[in-house]
Amino acid sequence: MQLNPAEISELIKSRIEGLAASSDIRNQGTVVSVTDGIVRIHGLSEVMQGEMLEFPATKDGQPSYGLALNLERDSVGAVILGEYEHISEGDTVKCTGRILEVPVGPELVGRVVNALGQPIDGKGPINAKLTDVIEKVAPGVIARQSVDQPLQTGIKSIDAMVPVGRGQRELIIGDRQTGKTAVAIDAIIAQKGQGVTCIYVAIGQKASSIKNVVRALEQAGAMEYTIVVAASASESAAMQYVSAYSGCTMGEYFRDRGEDALIVYDDLSKQAVAYRQVSLLLRRPPGREAYPGDVFYLHSRLLERAARVNADYVEAFTKGEVKGKTGSLTALPIIETQAGDVSAFVPTNVISITDGQIFLETSLFNAGIRPAINAGISVSRVGGAAQTKLVKGLSGGIRTDLAQYRELAAFAQFASDLDEATRKQLDRGARVTELLKQPQYTPLPISLMGATLFAVNKGFMDDVDVKKVLAFESGLHQFLKTSHGALLERLEKNRAFDKEGKDEAELTQAITAFKKSFA
């Protein structure tokens, strides 16, 4: 068969036109070494800091991802998120072009998830409609609003003396076994019916401890508005490091839509240790206490994201869907100290970043004063502006009584005979100290807390035996609930005494009536 040149060129042209040339340009590299969850990769020329890298799937077909942290001249250092036993030298690694993301939204509420937002509670998949990046820039000064709304923790000593406002960062610091987690869990339980979504991030905790926390939240009915992000001690250092940022992103979803959220980081000491481990394995130069140079930035960029944002920010973010509402993310980071040393590297860093701190002391805890809060050195730098009028008006005397009591108690040890005024102050201080004790998982509503503070401030407890103070308080609460429910409802609603003085008169009358019946 004879073909002329014109036919040949037509044939080639038609073949070229009919060719389905689908090309997939991907930036990929090769694994050079794998050690302790750290992978060195050669050939990833267009990778971003913090980008998700796709590794070969696990034996059961689950996708495997890593996080690019070290960008060097001829190689990339990455941490594997999850299992790494199946990865070997020579494996292909692909760029995804995406920064690490986690699912966000109301679908996560009531669930227990890992650091990547994957469910680990056995209640089925989470069908979240949205995802968001874990690393974000915190809202600027213009987008913020001053903290002036209270976040009630239900704990007498905190709400009276170191109040927390919505959008504040209040550090809980103390040695191990001083009740730090208990304070945070009580604060979460106290948000029931307050319209606050809570996120509890467990970093480096024992799996059994996390299970106990979840059980306590379920029994109190608090899981209905809580997300638990768990990175237990058995998980990799990378997962423990990432978990705090994942939880923060989940909280920001609510903040940016004009809602209120509370996040607890339990605890940031273990997150810093996990980050130190990752940094040392990546051969980054160590600094003080072998922590890397950016350990301050590790916590500052996390805690600065807790803020109260103004209505303009919320309106711009939601594209006009939500108007006239401010949003807030309140943070309660926890730091564990060694033998009460608050001047160590990580504690001083976090103290300088936060808006105040609640100090818990072993000596107080062992003396039976629980929560073991040292009111003398605990402060709230911005919460005073957010404190409810009811508690603010009554709490000034409490702090003064305690301060004078501590001063006189030390002096009274050496004095044999004390004058009447000193004895009165010592007696009042002993009763206030006793009154600030509170059982775990029993946060108080604002009305009952106000009644308690009113009773001690007006001297109704001065002649009650110290050992019977707590019995007097619980009896008074029960009496008010049964006989003066309307008064409690008014105090709960108005969060202040009325200007005419009727509420104060009724409360005085009620306490006097109860005291006559109290044996």
Swiss-Prot record:
Q: Which GO terms describe its molecular function?
A: ADP binding; ATP binding; proton-transporting ATP synthase activity, rotational mechanism
Q: Which residues cross the membrane?
A: none
**UniProt catalytic activity:** ATP + H2O + 4 H(+)(in) = ADP + phosphate + 5 H(+)(out)
Site note Required for activity applies to S378
* One CC-aspect GO term: proton-transporting ATP synthase complex
Question: What is the protein's quaternary organization?
Answer: F-type ATPases have 2 components, CF(1) - the catalytic core - and CF(0) - the membrane proton channel. CF(1) has five subunits: alpha(3), beta(3), gamma(1), delta(1), epsilon(1). CF(0) has three main subunits: a(1), b(2) and c(9-12). The alpha and beta chains form an alternating ring which encloses part of the gamma chain. CF(1) is attached to CF(0) by a central stalk formed by the gamma and epsilon chains, while a peripheral stalk is formed by the delta and b chains.
Task: Family membership, please give it.
Answer: Belongs to the ATPase alpha/beta chains family.
Task: Please state what the protein is called.
Answer: ATP synthase subunit alpha
Biological classification of the source = Bacteria, Pseudomonadati, Pseudomonadota, Betaproteobacteria, Burkholderiales
Q: Which gene encodes it?
A: atpA
